[in-house]
Amino acid sequence: MEGESTTAVISGFVFGALTFHHLNSGSDTEGFLLGDVMGEAKNSITDSQMDDVEVLYTIDIQKHVPCYQLSRFYNALGDLNIPELKKLLAGQKKSQNVIGWYKFRHNTEQIMTFRERLLHKNLQEHFSNSGLVFLLLTSNPATETKSTHRLEYALHKPQDGFFHKVPLVISNLGMSDQQGYKTLCGSCVSVGLNTAIKKHRLEFFNEDGALAEVNRISDMHMTLQEELKKTCSQLVESENSVEQLLEAVNDLKKQIAEKKLLMEEKGNKVSEDTEENVLLCEAFRRFFPQSALLQSCRLSLGGRQIPHSCSVSHNSSDVNELTLMVKQYDFPEAHRRQAGKRKAHSKQLGKTSTKKSRLPPFQRPQSDNSDSESSDSEKLLCTSGTETDGDIVQSLNVEVSRSKSPTF
């Protein structure tokens, strides 16, 4: 990508002479600027573009030629007076070219007039220089008493039919190359200074003339750089180890969460399988206190048999409400077995009068009026003297197979 930039440079001596001539004249003044235009191509290599060429033009204003009579080399229409123009520039050297012209105006603004534009176009055609510049200087009073004036100046250059301002730099006021520090010092001829330096030279300088402190600081800087590299490598290793540990911790957390879910699911199943049917256990103890076989049987709420016998008193508040009243259709086989055994018992009443019942008979407790109304659909479950423990367990197993949670 190619670009152009233009900068004008004027020495402090030339600029001071221009302002001196302007301030000592009673009217507007004008003249020509002499100097040279230099071009320099600057090639910058960037990441986006391999070649970035920029052309820098420097307008060096070296001298000015004043015109002591206003409008001497042109008329009111802006047409040039060629003979007067040649007389004005006759004594100049050939090495110094006309690079522009200037004009001082009192109490006006920094705007080119229409006549100045026409005159500038005619001067471009006469000198065959399309890069001709125009320096406009104006002065305005800065106070009401007009004791202080403000001087403004601008350098104009035509481009594409328009006049653009060109930066003007005064060399002894804004040139950075002349304001820089000197890196080399001149020879010192002072005898006293040489004596003082020789006396303390070994404390501050080495044998080769270099500053000792500078070398020490450079050595310390190199040592610090090496330590910094080591620390950076250790930091990278520690960061990598921390990342690995964090990944391992996250994996362990996931495994723990999965195990917790599995344990909760298993715990729910185990609790259903191992939780004892307390009401059934208390019912066996209350209604069959002398049957060790029934009291040794334990069933869970899910209907599964628990291998260990229960030896704990549950002390449930619902035990007092337990009865042996069950619905008739719950024990059809037990009802038929009991009816047949009652008939056999009536026939052999005399023979079995001496037999003792293993389980004491229990009569049905008195109930409310509501229980008496439903007595047709319920019956009393009791044992006779001829029933054995096997018969009782068989009857209970039939019921358990049909209903895993019997109602008492």
From Swiss-Prot:
Entry's localization field: Nucleus
Stretches of Polar residues bias are at 394-408
Instruction: Indicate where the modification Phosphoserine is found in the sequence.
Output: 405
According to the UniProt entry, the coiled-coil residues are: 210-272
Recount the PTM note: Phosphorylation of Ser-405 of the pSXXF motif by ATM or ATR constitutes a specific recognition motif for the BRCT domain of BRCA1.
The main location class comes to nucleus
Cellular component GO terms, alphabetical? BRCA1-A complex; nucleus
Q: What's the family? A: Belongs to the FAM175 family. Abraxas subfamily.
* Protein name per its UniProtKB record: BRCA1-A complex subunit Abraxas 1
Which organism is this entry from? Xenopus laevis
Q: Which gene encodes it?
A: abraxas1
